[in-house]
């Protein structure tokens, strides 16, 4: 250090004081280590011997690292002191530190390899020092800041290159974290695994990089970027590019699709970086937990889980019942005043020159002294002004008994004294509060609650303070958050009026009227006003006078806040009663000169000093063997927070240093107090030389069970407590159980101290309900009978009565954390955390411990401020060791340990941490941690036992018979019968769509079938019947001529959404080919989208590709060659300029069972499936839709969705040709440039029926939600819309459809218009809300029963209920039945099972290469095992149920509604229960406003939650605990890994469905570039 060679003792006093102040700033975290060294060097520079030719500012503390040797002459004490320079010894106990080290040593043997969280590299570089507000006294210069930034960048670089987190975790995987691989299993034999290295030199976060590194082998169609047949849109929420994964082709792999993917982890080799971490996490989780499994309880009734029953071996209290303890009688002294104001009047008249108060300036020098005469005269003026000069004579603003707020800074005691006594004299009730510093102070809203509950309308303040209050731009005082409107009155002397001669204040004898109100914050942060009556105030002063033996004319040094607690009781009230001279040392002076109070004691020969442990600690730190310090005048050093169990170490350490300066051990007097009961107990000063009272050394394990056991076995978990003396004079004290009825404790039991005394608070002002429970407690004995009728007041202190009636306090109710039936004190946990060395990670004074209720128990959370210079690895090491230490010493698991950037925790007015506000920030996700460690697996031990599936002894037949006997009908439903509906339309004669088009071209050539709109809403192309027919013929000719195509060949159609696609489809039918529509690759993102195209072409064995010129160029471009082998494309035919040729003949299939087209789609589980659609199925489907939606030539419909697969393709390409209606086509990508396009089209063309996808609906809801007024102004009117159907293959998204309906209700949209369709791979259209059926109904099911594969219907609003909407009306010709997927037996009404469908438009099978029909048979042609065993059904793979409703359908029968719950393939099986990802995701998305989207999947039984963050990156870590909490609370699952990513990372297919398996593969292959990955322990 710079002071080597400097004799500190010889330095001038001012320099020594400045050095002490610096030390203090460093210890409090107000200045960085660098800033400290720089400022210190500057101070010492003039005193460094000149021979040392060294720049003092950059000398290293560690002399070994510096080549320069410096003569070391610094005094020894200083060096020793430096090591503790950053310590806050309030929580310091050498014994405790030793204990923690021992506990950690025990853990070392079983080295715990916790996986370190992964931060995005960019996030690593941002040192928390940069993104936090500078500490309040920091003045680091700019060059230092830039140096710091540079160093942060360098260290981050080093962290990456030398010791990445992985290096620390597992050195055996060195080098492997940079390579990752992905493989794809293709059904046609190309199953080789391709391994390439992904170089990590420039790991930037840009997507471009991720894409540039995708490895697609030249001869393989496996892409690291997962194909989706469907999406062309750029990276945007609506319909996004599908990102990496391995697609398995559905066909032969169908049967093993899910299990095989789970086993092989999606083809990701085990040495991927992510996999290693997850493996580690699993290993960590395999370690035995507490409690053992036998203590888990069963969740049989499925009711709410209960906390486990306590262990029979827990220690129980064994002593006799406690007897109330009486304080000494309160003596009556003849000259005690009848009221406190009378004392002031007496001294003001008889001792006017006697000093009452001395205030200090910022340097600690006396600023002014207020005499008793001045105090009396000014208080009198103020009282007169308040009562007579604020309003008019007839309408005064204030009347006696009104409440007024006192707003004075801590540095101005004089103004406060005058205001307080002025109010007492005027008989208005003062309510002292803190000075508000900003509109959003920590706890400001609660102060507003206090002012409101006390009915305060007026605030007194000083001129200086008023000027400093935050103002609005026009100069008015700001309206503080939650505050009532206040009138502000300035009380400086120049504004006060001298009372008229005849005016005298009314000073009655002290009675039970309220004298003043003191504020108190509860554990939850609620601020209430404790009302103190005039008689209580006076009695309390008398009791303190007797206990402390105050004498007239003594001097008292008060370091405490004079607005409340002991600072007010001793320093403002009792001192005036006894004509004491008070020297008030403000907080600001203490920060600047921590020794100032000691110097004041010395200078003024003070007899009493009033301090807190913090002041002892600061003074001790700043002390440098000053010659001019003598404390022998003190007869009492009152330690106001002596009730803090850790105060004993501060007292001992202070005595250690100052005993040589005249401090006598018997003068240290700890006391215990609470806002409600005021002073509870205080140690009286002992006679000189008397031995100090003995300490209690208690077992922490005993304390956690609420019993007193002297610690014998393990010194590591002991708590040493000092007494707080005897109970106050005139008081009666009991100890009662802290929860439940106030039963008296036993002698060896810890309980809450309750006090009966005339000297306590009387009520919470304005809150009678809460008052009763606190101020009117009547203790009962073990039999439950009251011990008397005197009411006691709860103190909020936990303790016991020791030998000799000494009171011991071991904690406070508000710091109590009750976890699994055991009690832990927050302060004890803080002490343990801080005893974990090295504490170079966090600031000692800035740590908050609280509990949050998650899953029916309290969970412990620790939040600390991280030093800006702490690195990731040190922080993580420290955090891991804190977990171990707390586990060893307190036997309690930590739920969450979070580090936040320096100076960001909310502060109390005097610099402490505002714990309730911190907890509030934690729970609302606004704490912004820079490091977090969650351990739910360790501490959540009350989960219900995993469900064991019992073998069902009853067969399907018995179940069915049972249902029938019970009067339950079999769960089946059907649409209208196709055969019975007479369809006179001419097209009925045509079995094939190709014939229907020819017939339409002949009979109605100019009828417009299709109109395609662009972003401006202009029709860019139209197609009449004859135009479409002619264009199809041209394409047929080209196919036969150029393509060399044979009948039955597959042809890929690669077109953007439009009319070309439709013409090419019919061109293929005319040529006898099988069309396969494929979504074209996205030109800006070929590497992600082209492999899918390639895969479909390969899997379908396409003979040629029909496409546009632009797309043909793209397929053959250099960019494409980077992703796929462009030399092996099949024949590509561009259809832009075709010659006018007609084919010789048009093909007519010999039977309607022949294939019409193939429908390929990527499922949400990443499976590519192609299904075969025959001509008869196409015909039946078009007919069914025509009848359901009443489509005929004069109708117009609008379609805004992708036309590549499923029902979307049928509506876009087939339906109009069959039914003759006009379809207005709106490509969804046009909405990106013009959001209102779809809605304005509906309005402009007065469309009655429209079809869209969820992506489109979501885009409109999010993008146009705020623009309804603008749309109205443009005359957009949706009242014409009769049905708006969302085409989907999933459970209806009720929240989205409802918000869409609500948002656009203002534009005339009928709330009944919006409905959903449901289709699957085996049947593209099962339900579609038509014109005839009843409106879709909604039911509420219990989520817990769904997990058990049961349906329990509940009322709307029931807890854990899930709303499900019917998926539209069954199409004509469709029958569904609900079947048990395992037994294949039919189920009863309202039972959950797989939906099976029978319909003439079922697909005829999966398109496979090897023709393995056995697998398909199971899905497309399967029979029930009992009941109707003849009918052939297709299995949809979706779970759902049928419920008969009260509504009537078109035929007049009761309507059977089908409710889809979700895809079987997608469900997650966890803890023996079945979960639907969407349910967990819905909960997650509600957890925080910055969660844009989420997706969940499992990996080796761990639940992984991926969350898209829409806010700033500093919010990333806020999400981790919130996501963990919500999933635990609502789904009873522990999240294993939380991954925070950028918006748009979760891949979505064209139907707007999340592709969770792609996401999973990308995550495991380390391709997501996450912002943060948290591994929950």
Swiss-Prot record:
Belongs to the DIP2 family. GO terms for cellular component: axon; dendrite; perikaryon. Residues 7-124 form the DMAP1-binding domain. This is Disco-interacting protein 2 homolog B-A. The lineage of its organism: Eukaryota, Metazoa, Chordata, Craniata, Vertebrata. Residues 176-187 have a biased composition (Low complexity). Gene3D superfamilies: 3.30.300.30, N-terminal domain of ligase-like (3.40.50.12780). The gene is dip2ba. It is found in: Cell projection, Dendrite; Cell projection, Axon; Perikaryon. Negatively regulates axonal outgrowth and is essential for normal synaptic transmission. Not required for regulation of axon polarity. Promotes acetylation of alpha-tubulin. Disulfide bonds: none annotated. Keywords: Cell projection, Neurogenesis.
């Amino acid at each position: 250090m710079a002071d080597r060679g400097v004799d500190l003792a010889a330095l001038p006093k001012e320099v020594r004081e400045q050095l002490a102040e610096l030390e203090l700033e460093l210890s409090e975290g107000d200045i960085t280590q660098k800033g400290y060294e720089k400022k210190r060097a500057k101070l010492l520079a003039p005193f460094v011997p000149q021979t040392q030719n060294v720049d003092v500012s950059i000398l290293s503390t560690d002399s070994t690292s510096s080549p320069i040797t410096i003569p070391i002459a610094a005094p020894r004490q200083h060096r020793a002191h430096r090591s503790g320079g950053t310590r806050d010894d309030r929580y310091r106990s050498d014994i405790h530190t030793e204990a923690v080290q021992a506990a950690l040593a025990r853990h070392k043997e079983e080295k715990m390899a916790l996986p370190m969280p992964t931060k995005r590299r960019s996030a690593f570089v941002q040192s928390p020092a940069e993104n936090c507000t500078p500490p309040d006294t920091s003045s680091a210069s700019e060059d230092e800041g830039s140096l710091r930034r540079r160093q942060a960048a360098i260290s981050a670089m080093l962290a990456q290159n030398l010791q990445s987190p992985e290096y620390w975790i597992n050195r055996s995987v060195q080098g492997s974290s940079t390579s990752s691989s992905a493989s794809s299993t293709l059904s046609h034999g190309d199953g080789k695994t391709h391994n390439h290295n992904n170089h990590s030199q420039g790991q930037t976060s840009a997507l471009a990089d991720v894409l540039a590194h995708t490895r697609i082998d030249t001869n393989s169609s496996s892409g690291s970027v997962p194909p989706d047949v469907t999406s062309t849109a750029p990276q945007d929420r609506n319909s996004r590019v599908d990102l990496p994964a391995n697609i398995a082709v559905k066909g032969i792999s169908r049967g093993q699709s899910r299990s095989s993917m789970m086993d092989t982890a999606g083809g990701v080799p085990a040495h991927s970086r992510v996999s290693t971490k997850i493996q580690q996490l699993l290993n960590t989780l395999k370690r035995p937990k507490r409690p053992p499994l036998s203590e888990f309880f069963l969740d049989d009734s499925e009711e709410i889980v209960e906390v486990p029953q306590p262990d029979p071996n827990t220690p129980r209290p064994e002593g006799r019942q406690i007897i109330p303890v009486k304080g000494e009688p309160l003596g009556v002294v003849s000259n005690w005043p009848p009221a406190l104001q009378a004392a002031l009047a007496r001294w003001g008249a008889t001792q006017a020159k006697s000093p009452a108060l001395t205030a200090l300036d910022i340097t600690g020098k006396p600023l002014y002294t207020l005499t008793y005469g001045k105090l009396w005269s000014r208080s009198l003026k103020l009282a007169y002004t308040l009562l007579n000069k604020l309003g008019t004579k007839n309408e005064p603003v204030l009347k006696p008994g009104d409440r007024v707020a006192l707003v004075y800074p801590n540095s101005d005691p004089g103004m406060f004294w005058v205001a307080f006594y002025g109010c007492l004299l005027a008989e208005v009730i003062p309510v002292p509060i803190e000075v508000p510093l900003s509109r959003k102070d920590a706890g400001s809203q609660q102060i507003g609650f206090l002012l409101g509950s006390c009915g305060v309308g007026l605030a007194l303040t000083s001129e200086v303070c008023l000027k400093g209050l935050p103002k609005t731009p026009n100069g008015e005082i700001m309206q503080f958050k939650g505050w009532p409107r206040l009138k502000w009155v300035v009380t400086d002397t120049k504004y006060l009026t001298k009372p008229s001669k005849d005016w005298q204040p009314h000073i009655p004898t002290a009675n039970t009227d309220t004298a003043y109100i003191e504020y108190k914050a509860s554990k939850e942060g609620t601020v209430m006003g404790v009302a103190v009556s005039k008689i209580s105030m006076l009695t309390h002063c008398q009791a303190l006078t007797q206990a402390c033996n105050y004498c007239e004319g003594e001097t008292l040094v008060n370091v405490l806040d004079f607005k409340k607690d002991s600072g007010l009781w001793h320093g403002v009230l009792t001192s005036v009663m006894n004509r004491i001279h008070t020297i008030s040392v403000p907080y600001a002076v203490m920060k600047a000169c921590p020794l100032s109070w000691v110097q004041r004691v010395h200078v003024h020969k003070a007899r009493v000093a009033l301090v807190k442990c913090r002041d002892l600690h600061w003074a001790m730190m700043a002390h440098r063997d000053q010659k001019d310090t003598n404390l022998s005048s003190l007869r009492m050093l009152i330690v106001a927070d002596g009730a803090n169990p850790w105060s004993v170490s501060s007292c001992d350490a202070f005595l250690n240093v100052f005993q040589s300066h005249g401090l006598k051990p018997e003068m240290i007097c700890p006391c215990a107090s609470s806002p409600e009961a005021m002073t509870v107990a205080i140690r009286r000063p002992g006679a000189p030389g008397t031995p100090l009272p003995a300490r209690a050394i208690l077992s922490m394990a005993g304390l956690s069970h609420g019993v007193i056991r002297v610690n014998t076995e393990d010194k590591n978990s002991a708590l040493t407590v000092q007494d707080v003396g005897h109970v106050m004079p005139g008081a009666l004290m009991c100890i009662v159980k802290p929860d439940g009825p106030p039963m008296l404790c036993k002698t060896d039991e810890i309980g809450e101290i309750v006090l009966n005394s005339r000297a306590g608070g009387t009520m919470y002002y304005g809150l009678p309900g809460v008052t009763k429970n606190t101020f009117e407690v009547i203790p009962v004995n073990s039999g439950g009978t009251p011990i008397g009728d005197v009411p006691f007041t709860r103190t909020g202190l936990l303790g016991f009565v020791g030998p000799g009636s000494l009171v011991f306090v071991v904690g406070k109710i508000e710091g109590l954390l009750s976890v699994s039936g055991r009690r832990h004190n927050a302060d004890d946990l803080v002490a343990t955390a801080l005893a974990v060395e090295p504490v170079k990670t966090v600031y000692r004074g800035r740590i908050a411990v609280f509990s949050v209720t998650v899953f029916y128990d309290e969970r412990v959370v620790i939040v600390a401020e991280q030093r800006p210079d702490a690195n990731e690895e040190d922080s993580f090491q420290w955090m891991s060791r804190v977990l171990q230490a707390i586990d060893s010493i307190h036997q309690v698991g930590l739920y969450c340990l979070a580090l936040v950037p320096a100076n960001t925790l909310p502060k109390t007015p005097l610099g402490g941490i505002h714990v309730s506000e911190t907890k509030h920030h934690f729970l609302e996700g606004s704490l912004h941690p820079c490091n977090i460690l969650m351990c739910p697996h360790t501490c959540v031990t009350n989960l219900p036992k995993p469900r064991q599936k019992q073998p069902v002894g009853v067969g399907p037949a018995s179940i069915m018979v049972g249902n029938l006997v019970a009067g339950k009908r079999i769960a089946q439903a059907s649409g209208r019968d196709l055969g019975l509906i007479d369809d006179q339309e001419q097209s009925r004669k045509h079995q094939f769509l190709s014939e229907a088009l020819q017939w339409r071209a002949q009979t109605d050539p100019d009828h417009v079938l299709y109109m395609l709109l662009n972003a401006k809403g202009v029709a860019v192309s139209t197609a009449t019947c004859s135009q479409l027919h002619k264009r199809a013929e041209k394409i047929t000719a080209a196919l036969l001529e150029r393509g060399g195509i044979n009948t039955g060949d597959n042809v890929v159609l690669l077109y953007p959404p439009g009319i070309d696609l439709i013409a090419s489809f019919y061109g293929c039918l005319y040529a006898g080919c099988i069309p396969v529509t494929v979504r074209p690759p996205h030109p800006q993102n070929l590497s992600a989208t082209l492999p899918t195209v390639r895969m479909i072409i390969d899997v379908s064995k396409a003979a040629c590709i029909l496409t546009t010129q632009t797309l043909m160029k793209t397929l053959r471009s250099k960019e494409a060659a980077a992703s796929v082998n462009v030399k092996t494309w099949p024949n590509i035919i561009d259809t832009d300029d075709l010659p006018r040729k007609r084919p010789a003949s048009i093909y007519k299939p010999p039977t309607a069972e022949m294939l019409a087209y193939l429908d390929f789609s990527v499922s949400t589980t990443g499976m590519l499936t192609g299904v075969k659609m025959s001509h008869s199925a196409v015909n039946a489907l078009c007919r069914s839709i025509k009848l359901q939606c009443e489509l005929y030539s004069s109708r117009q419909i609008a379609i805004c969705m992708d036309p590549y697969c499923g029902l979307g393709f049928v509506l876009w390409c087939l339906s109009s040709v069959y039914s003759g209606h006009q379809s207005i086509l709106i490509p969804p990508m046009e909405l990106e440039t013009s959001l209102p396009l779809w809605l304005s089209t509906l309005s402009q063309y007065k469309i009655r029926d429209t079809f869209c996808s969820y992506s489109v609906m979501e885009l409109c809801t999010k993008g146009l939600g705020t623009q309804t007024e603008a749309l109205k102004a443009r005359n957009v009117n949706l009242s014409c819309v009769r049905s708006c159907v969302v085409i989907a293959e999933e459970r209806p998204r009720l929240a989205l459809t409802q918000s869409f309906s609500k948002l656009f209700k203002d534009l005339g949209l009928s709330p009944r218009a919006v409905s959903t369709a449901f289709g699957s791979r085996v049947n593209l259209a099962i339900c579609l809300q038509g014109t005839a059926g009843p409106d879709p109904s909604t039911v509420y099911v219990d989520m817990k029963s769904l997990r058990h594969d049961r349906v329990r219907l509940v009322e709307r609003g029931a807890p854990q209920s899930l709303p499900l909407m019917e998926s539209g009306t069954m199409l004509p010709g469709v029958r569904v039945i609900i079947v048990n997927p395992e037994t294949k037996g039919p189920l009863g009404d309202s039972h959950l099972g797989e939906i099976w469908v029978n319909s003439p438009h079922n697909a005829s099978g999966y398109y496979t290469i090897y023709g393995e029909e056995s697998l398909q048979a199971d899905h497309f042609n399967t029979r029930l095992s009992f009941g109707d065993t003849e009918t052939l059904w297709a299995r949809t793979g979706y779970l759902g149920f049928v419920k008969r409703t009260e509504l009537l359908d078109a035929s007049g029968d009761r309507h059977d509604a089908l409710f889809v719950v979700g895809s079987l393939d997608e469900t997650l099986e966890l803890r023996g229960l079945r979960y639907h990802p969407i349910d967990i995701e819905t909960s997650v998305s509600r957890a925080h406003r910055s969660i844009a989207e989420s997706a969940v999947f499992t990996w080796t039984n761990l639940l992984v939650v991926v969350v898209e963050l829409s806010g700033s990156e500093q919010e990333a870590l806020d999400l981790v605990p919130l996501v963990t909490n919500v999933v635990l609370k609502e789904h009873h699952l522990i999240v294993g890994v939380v991954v925070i990513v950028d918006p748009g990372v979760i891949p979505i297919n064209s139907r707007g469905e999340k592709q969770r398996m792609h996401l999973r593969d990308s995550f495991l292959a380390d391709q997501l570039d996450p912002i943060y990955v948290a591994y929950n322990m």
